[in-house]
UniProtKB/Swiss-Prot annotation:
Main location: secreted
Database matches in InterPro entries: C-type_lectin-like, C-type_lectin-like/link_sf, C-type_lectin_CS, CLec_Tetranectin-domain, CTDL_fold
Domain called C-type lectin: residue spans: 74-192
Source taxon at top rank: Eukaryota
Organism per entry: Mus musculus (Mouse)
Function recorded in the entry: Promotes cell adhesion to laminin and fibronectin.
Disulfide bonds: C68-C78, C95-C191, C167-C183
Subcellular location: Secreted
Protein name: C-type lectin domain family 3 member A
Gene Ontology terms, MF aspect: carbohydrate binding
Signal sequence interval, chain numbering: 1-22
Length: 196
């Protein structure tokens, strides 16, 4: 019986040794498997983020196309006329909420396009806000993004308001010439949307 017990004990010990010999290699395999799963998980997360960016870009393009259908397209911009009167800051906030800004004409072609669009979409309206002001430094006109405006189209004797009139109006009656106005005045406005 002692012999059987010894054989049994040797058998159990050899089985245990076999089990412990494979333990480090199984642990390595598990760690390697975890790394592969984590790499695949990171790759999937990256792909999902990329898809969300593409979906958001498509939504933005669709919104721009909707704006262009309701307004007009000029070069790489869409213009959309306002429905009501607002003072300068409210008008710009309204444009921003729609994905654009107050319109800033950059050349005489855009002045002509704005004049024509203004006549069609704002009949009977004499003037409307532009996204230009000199609120920071008197006489230094900046666009709504804070950049200096290089193209200016002032009417005779304008700007004339000094520190009281810091925002810029587009005048239909003066063939698209500009004048300065108190920013708290309520005026119509046109939003512009840049088409990428």
């Amino acid at each position: 019986m002692a012999k059987n017990g010894l054989v049994l004990c040797i058998l159990v010990v050899s089985l245990l040794l076999d089990q412990t010999d494979g333990y480090p290699s199984r642990m390595k395999a598990r760690k390697h498997s975890k790394r592969r799963v984590k790499a695949k998980d990171d790759d999937l997360k990256s792909q999902v983020e990329k898809l969300w960016r593409e979906v958001n870009a498509l939504k933005e393009m669709q919104a721009l196309q909707t704006v262009c259908l309701r307004g007009t397209k000029v070069h790489k911009k869409c213009y959309l006329a306002s429905e009501g009167l607002k003072h300068y800051h409210e008008a710009n906030e309204d444009c921003i909420s729609k994905g654009g800004t107050l319109v800033v004409p950059r050349n005489s072609d855009e002045i002509n396009a704005l004049r024509d669009y203004g006549k069609r979409s704002l009949p009977g309206v004499n003037d409307f806000w532009l996204g230009i002001n000199d609120m920071v430094t008197e006489g230094k006109f900046l666009d709504v993004h804070g950049f200096a405006v290089s193209f200016l189209n002032w009417d005779r004797a304008q700007p004339s308001g000094g520190k009281r009139e810091n925002c810029v109006l587009f005048s239909q009656s003066a063939q698209g010439k500009w004048s300065d106005e108190a920013c708290r005045s309520s005026k119509r406005y046109i939003c512009e949307f840049i088409i990428p």
